[in-house]
């Protein structure tokens, strides 16, 4: 089997399908980007990273730098270079004996990749849904939803990382409801601790000068976070160190940015900036408490499944989260807060317990049973089940 994944622009998609090579003969991870975005990143169509390369055994990568408008404005033309590249790769990794069985699989992560499916006509297609994409492109929401409904009809299996999106797509395309599955993110192998950690592990970089406890957040610093809550939390624990990992936001006139800037300016807040994916698991393990302070009611937070749930679960350390839908699914392992007072109380309670909430073993068990490799295998189980009911 050769499985092409279009695309892995988000780390969660890459982490999942990078561990799927146990189920397939080869995996091709595709990064596809607009020329303007690529230019800002220093990438050109002739850059070395745009060449097809086998980065590790049976895991191939290729980056496409495409003209502006390739996805939404003229997708039939824009997808052609990607389709040609996938066909060449299938021929390259497929058996030399043309009579041998070889399945050509395609994973698509946006509805617009339906045009890629139509050009390739693979043996099977998986629609891997990460978000409510109409929120990305609200001015063409009707077009996005129409294309998504057709994608669900055509795909052999649709996998949604959030339950809300699962329910929405089942209702929108009832004739394909049996092919739509809720499958939350898995824990990437590098994020899984070797053992349960009732107490924080050593830091991956010299931070011993910062006083404990360490309250950590890893992720984008944006409007989706409850910044007033974070400011209240910093006020409540002036002796704690708030360790923030993520690129600082660009200045903005939006009210959230003022609250964010006020938080980052505090003496007990330490914004470390961006860190490589390979290091993040160790940061989760070194925090006294991992924070998921998403703003309740924010449309993106309602529709998404934050990867940091299972990333932090793999570290086994205590997690305090606001009550967004996907966090509500783990009330026995996350300290889920319905409001600011409950969030503050949960943090205080854990710190009063010496940063050990007694749940490290249970979190370790859940993460171990839901690694990215195991979650990827479930997709192929869904695919087999779908074939059996045809």
Predicted feature locations:
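Carbohydrate-associated surface elements
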Residues: 164, 183-186, 195, 287
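Conserved donor-binding/catalytic core segment of Leloir-type glycosyltransferases
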Residues: 206-225, 230-234, 242-245
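A short, active-site helix/loop in glycosyltransferases that binds the activated sugar's phosphate group
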Residues: 116, 155-180
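Acidic donor-binding loop of glycosyltransferase active sites
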Residues: 268, 284-302, 317
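Membrane-proximal helix-turn-helix segments that form the acceptor-binding/catalytic region
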Residues: 92-94, 101, 140-158
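A charged, aromatic-enriched C-terminal amphipathic alpha-helix characteristic of glycosyltransferases
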Residues: 355-386
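Nucleotide-activated donor-binding/catalytic signature segment of Leloir-type glycosyltransferases, i.e.
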Residues: 246, 256-282
């Amino acid at each position: 089997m050769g499985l092409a994944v279009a695309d892995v622009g988000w780390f969660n998609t890459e982490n999942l399908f990078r561990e799927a090579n146990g189920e397939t003969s080869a995996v091709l991870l595709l990064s596809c980007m607009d020329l303007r975005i690529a230019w800002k990143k220093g990438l050109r169509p002739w850059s070395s990273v745009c060449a097809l390369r086998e980065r590790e055994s049976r895991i191939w990568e290729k980056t496409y730098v495409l003209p502006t408008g390739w996805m939404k404005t003229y997708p039939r033309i824009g997808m052609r270079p990607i389709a040609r590249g996938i066909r060449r790769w299938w021929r390259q990794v497929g058996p030399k004996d043309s009579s041998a069985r070889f399945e050509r699989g395609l994973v698509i992560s946006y509805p617009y990749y339906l045009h890629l499916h139509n050009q390739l006509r693979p043996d099977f297609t998986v629609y891997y849904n990460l978000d409510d994409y109409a929120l990305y492109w609200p001015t063409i929401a009707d077009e996005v939803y129409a294309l998504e409904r057709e994608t669900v009809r055509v795909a052999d299996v649709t996998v949604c990382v959030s339950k809300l999106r699962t329910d929405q797509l089942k209702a929108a395309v009832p004739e394909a409801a049996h092919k739509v599955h809720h499958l939350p993110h898995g824990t990437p192998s590098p994020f899984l601790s070797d053992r349960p950690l009732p107490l924080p592990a050593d830091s991956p970089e010299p931070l011993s000068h910062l006083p404990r406890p360490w309250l950590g957040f890893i992720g984008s610093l944006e409007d989706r976070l409850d910044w007033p809550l974070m400011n209240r939390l910093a006020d409540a624990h002036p002796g704690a160190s708030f360790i923030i990992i993520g690129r600082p936001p660009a200045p903005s006139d939006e009210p959230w940015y003022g609250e964010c800037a006020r938080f980052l300016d505090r003496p007990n807040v330490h914004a470390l900036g961006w860190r490589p994916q390979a290091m993040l698991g160790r940061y989760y393990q070194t925090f006294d408490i991992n924070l998921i302070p998403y703003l309740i009611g924010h449309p993106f937070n309602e529709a998404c499944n934050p990867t940091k749930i299972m990333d932090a679960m793999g570290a086994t350390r205590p997690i305090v989260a606001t009550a967004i839908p996907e966090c509500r699914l783990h009330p026995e392992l996350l300290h889920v807060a319905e409001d600011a007072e409950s969030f503050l109380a949960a943090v205080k309670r854990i710190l009063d317990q010496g940063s050990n909430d007694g749940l490290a073993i249970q979190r370790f068990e859940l993460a171990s049973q839901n690694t990215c490799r195991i979650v990827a295998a479930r997709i192929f189980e869904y695919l087999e089940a779908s074939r059996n009911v045809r």
